[in-house]
Amino acid sequence: MTKEMTTESPAEQKRSSSSQNLCDRVAVVTGASSGIGRAIALALAGKGAQVRLVSRKLDTLEYLVKTAREHSLRASACRVDLTRDEDIHALVADLEGNDGRVDVLVHCAGEIRHAEHARAPLTDFDAQYRANVRGPYLLTQCLLPLLRAASGQVVFINSSSGLRARARSGQFAATQHAMKAIADSLREEVNADGIRVLSVFPGRTATPRTEQLFQEERKAYRPELLMQPEDVAAMVVHALKMPRTCEVTEISIRPLFKSY
């Protein structure tokens, strides 16, 4: 029997494999101290990935790392404020020096502040822009060489506000629309390198941030009627594991029961 010849390059053969195995992959998850970011980080670790947990809350991260390791999961913590360029560059240097690779980058950190247009302070707009737009943009830019080398994947955890703006959400929604634009543009630039880019637009999810929003709106907070962070994490992991012949570009996910 003669061996069938193939004209695929090694990179093409890698990209066309039946599915993406997350075991031993290096994943960086920002906003990993709570909510959706925490759920995604734990889900990736549960699939065998080496997860770098990134947040401003180091104490919370270290407790999460301790818990993960008690269950034989691989995780490490890094305190990073995405509004500070020096923090981002320090994280990148650490990843380059210790891991030397990044297979998955998940952007889940962010700021959300709601107010009517007439009263919303520009300082709030600036803070949300730096955390939700500029920080993720710079971190992705700095990690692109490692992502290209790994034919990696980038996930932007956006918001339903990234698709539709509502009253009192003008500043936040503007940053989420900007994040979608960054993801769409990046996808066009890096697909040829084997990098996949996913935007996720969750509706209201049972997280501390959502509870705060309900309090601001003077509405009863019923987390059992909302999506759970693990729901979003399951969708993200499924998309990351899809065969390399395809790409999930956007996921819009909402609670089944609308309590708002």
Could you tell me what each predicted segment is?
Residues S159:
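Residue(s) in the substrate-gating loop at a strand-loop-helix junction
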Residues I195, S199-V200, A220-Y260:
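C-terminal helical subdomain
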Residues C108-R113:
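Conserved NAD(P)H cofactor-binding loop of Rossmann-fold oxidoreductase domains
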Residues A49-L64:
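Conserved glycine-rich Rossmann-like NAD(P)H-binding loop of the short-chain dehydrogenase/reductase
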Residues V26, S33-S34:
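Conserved glycine-rich cofactor-binding loop
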Residues E116-H117, P121-Y129:
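Substrate-binding pocket helix/loop in short-chain dehydrogenase/reductase
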Residues T140, T175-Q176:
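Active-site helix of classical SDR
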